[in-house]
């Protein structure tokens, strides 16, 4: 490379094949064509800082690939600053290809690898009130990341070498750029140096460090601009900041995964960081002993699952009385009947044979069979033909229905000794160690009482659910037999009446509940009307605050005139809103939402 007193910077400032997301960044082709060629050079600044001009843009060119910019950096103070930065920056000194060392060029590629064009906002008219006309292009800036894609900057001390990296640029335009550069060098005198605002430059560099997915976006811009690999671009570099040491094994290189990159307030081209920090705000810390106590209480109070009873043939009426008197042989030996007083016989009953012998019907006394005035309503089998029926399993309660029998409590289980880190290791001085334990224990007790109440209500509902609210007689199965003492067509018996125990007195919360109407009656129409007035889920979901559908567009004022400019630098636009953090929920409310939802869904369902 031929050494030169200035550094050239070229690149696309707008690519039609990669349109930007923001409407204000779109450039009208007719407007751009009317503004070219430039009547005078445009200022070249750093990060759109008006008090940091470092050179001039001597031409903007419309090519088939997009709007192309060519500029030169002539500020002596800025070039000296680049030399100092290079010696202290490890990323600037890293190279993937064996290229000649260029401290200024390599420092620029590591610090300001993108171009940004500042143009007039499309909503602002170009004609002023006094009849003047505003220039559409205001200035071009070198920045850390542009808001338009494909705006990668290529620096170099040789203009021909810089233009060679853009394969989408027409040779005719490249030749025109070289001619304009020579003419601008002859016309321009000694460049004026302005003192650099170092504080602002450092602030912009800090903002650029929090751009989300900056390295990945720079790689994308490089691909859109179609720039080959033999350049000083740092977008694909992964610098090894550790000195090589053969004696010690070097650790693995730092990850460049976009998910691990930081983000910050860098304008519309980036989003603020902190997405992963909100993941732990919904968690609470519970001591291990408290958690194990809650888990044990849950297991102790959980009712056992009721296994379905094996299928058996239907039993004749009052067969349990015959099974109780069965001899010591046969399937019914040893069966125990329930306590008496559960059934009353208004007429007669048929007890059936005792041992399963068909001839036992003839040997039975006459009083063992009592005719009934009505014929049997159904036919279920022949008692005694296949032997006595299987024994009736024992029942609990005042009706023929199995109830839940809670398992014995594990009160004799050895309690774990409290650990030091659980009792006082995670607490600050003066903090009560039983604060969370009392809240959780009280909540667990309330949940257990509610579950027992719901189970009692469910058992009562299932007990009387087949006959409505009233205690109507329960009709049992009827049987016939064709033996000498069997039922004849003109004979019948009356169904035994079921006399249950009186129901328990209703509690306060049970009495307040409305009883369902008995079968055969029509529910009042007011219930249907009330259901029709229930709001839908979609309406309830939309009851929250609505977002503003017409947000005000941000405006950016020009640095030396009252124009509204559009700056295409991602790090030059600060976010107007800070990420809102959700309010922390109280401990009791959060615990209530966890345990109520988990325990009630598993037990009551």
From Swiss-Prot:
Biased composition, class Polar residues, residue ranges: 568-579
Chain intervals for the UniProt region annotation (Disordered): 235-274, 403-431, 489-588
Chain span(s) of sequence motif Nuclear localization signal: 410-416
Coiled-coil residue windows: none
Active site (UniProt): 48 (charge relay system), 116 (charge relay system), 139 (charge relay system)
Any one GO BP annotation for this protein: viral release from host cell
Pfam family, one: Peptidase_S21
Matching InterPro entries: Herpes_virus_sf, Peptidase_S21
Enzymatic class: hydrolase
Any one Gene Ontology cellular component term annotated for this protein: host cell nucleus
Region Interaction with major capsid protein, residue ranges: 585-605
GO terms assigned for molecular function: identical protein binding; serine-type endopeptidase activity
Keywords: Host cytoplasm, Host nucleus, Hydrolase, Phosphoprotein, Protease, Serine protease, Viral capsid assembly, Viral release from host cell
Protease in keyword set: yes
Enzyme Commission number(s): 3.4.21.97
Swiss-Prot/TrEMBL domain comment: Region of interaction between pPR and pAP is called Amino conserved domain (ACD). The region of interaction with major capsid protein is called carboxyl conserved domain (CCD).
Family the UniProt entry places it in: Belongs to the herpesviridae capsid scaffolding protein family.
Name of this chain's protein: Capsid scaffolding protein
Species, as recorded: Epstein-Barr virus (strain GD1) (HHV-4)
């Amino acid at each position: 490379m031929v050494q030169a007193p200035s550094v050239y910077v070229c690149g696309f400032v707008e690519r039609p094949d990669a349109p930007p997301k923001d409407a204000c960044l779109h450039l009208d082709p007719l407007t751009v064509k009317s503004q070219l060629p430039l009547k005078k050079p445009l200022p070249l600044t750093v990060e759109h800082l008006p008090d940091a001009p470092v050179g001039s843009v001597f031409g903007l060119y419309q090519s088939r690939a997009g709007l192309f910019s060519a500029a030169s950096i002539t500020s002596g103070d800025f070039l000296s600053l680049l030399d100092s930065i290079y010696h202290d920056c490890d990323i600037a000194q890293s190279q993937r290809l064996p290229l000649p060392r260029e401290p200024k060029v390599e420092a620029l590629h590591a610090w300001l690898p993108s171009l940004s064009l500042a143009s007039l906002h499309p909503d602002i008219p170009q004609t002023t009130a006094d009849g003047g006309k505003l220039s559409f292009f205001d200035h071009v800036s070198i920045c850390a990341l542009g808001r338009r894609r494909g705006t990668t900057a290529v620096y170099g001390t040789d203009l021909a070498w810089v233009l060679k990296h853009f394969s989408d640029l027409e040779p005719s335009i490249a030749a025109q750029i070289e001619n304009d550069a020579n003419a601008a060098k002859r016309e321009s005198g000694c460049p004026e140096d302005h003192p650099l605002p170092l504080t602002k430059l450092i602030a912009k560099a800090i903002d650029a460090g929090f751009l989300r997915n900056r390295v990945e976006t720079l790689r994308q811009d490089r691909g859109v601009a179609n720039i080959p690999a033999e350049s000083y671009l740092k977008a694909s570099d992964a610098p090894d900041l550790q000195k090589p040491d053969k004696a010690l094994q070097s650790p693995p290189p730092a990850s460049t995964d976009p998910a691990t990159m930081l983000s910050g307030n860098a304008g519309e081209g980036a989003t603020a960081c902190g997405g992963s920090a909100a993941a732990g705000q919904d968690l609470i810390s519970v001591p291990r002993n408290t958690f194990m106590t809650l888990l044990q209480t849950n297991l102790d109070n959980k009712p056992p699952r009721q296994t379905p009873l094996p299928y058996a043939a239907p039993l004749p009426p009052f067969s349990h009385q015959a099974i109780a008197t069965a001899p010591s042989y046969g399937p019914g030996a040893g069966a125990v009947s329930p306590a008496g007083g559960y059934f009353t016989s208004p007429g007669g009953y048929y007890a059936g044979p005792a041992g399963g012998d068909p001839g036992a019907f003839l040997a039975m006394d006459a009083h063992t069979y009592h005719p009934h005035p009505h014929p049997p309503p159904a036919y279920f089998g022949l008692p005694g033909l296949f032997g006595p029926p299987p024994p009736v399993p024992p029942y609990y309660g005042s009706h023929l229905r199995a109830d839940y029998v809670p398992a014995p409590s594990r009160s004799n289980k050895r309690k774990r000794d409290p650990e030091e880190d659980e009792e006082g290791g995670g607490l600050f001085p003066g903090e009560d160690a039983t604060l969370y334990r009392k809240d959780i224990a009280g909540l667990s007790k309330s949940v257990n009482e509610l579950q027992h109440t719901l189970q009692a209500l469910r058992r009562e509902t299932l007990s009387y659910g087949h006959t409505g609210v009233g205690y109507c007689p329960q009709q049992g199965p009827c049987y016939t037999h064709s033996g000498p003492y069997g039922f004849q067509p003109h004979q019948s018996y009356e169904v035994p009446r079921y006399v249950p125990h009186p129901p328990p007195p209703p509690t306060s919360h049970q009495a307040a509940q409305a009883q369902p109407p008995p079968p055969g009656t029509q529910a009042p129409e007011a219930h249907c009307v009330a259901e029709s007035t229930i709001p839908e889920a979609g309406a309830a979901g939309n009851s929250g605050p609505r977002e503003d559908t017409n947000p005000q567009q941000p405006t950016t004022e020009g640095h030396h005139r009252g124009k509204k400019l559009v700056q295409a630098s991602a790090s030059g636009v600060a976010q107007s809103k800070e990420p809102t953090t959700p309010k922390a929920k109280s401990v009791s409310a959060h615990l209530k939402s966890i345990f109520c939802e988990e325990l009630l869904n598993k037990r009551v369902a």
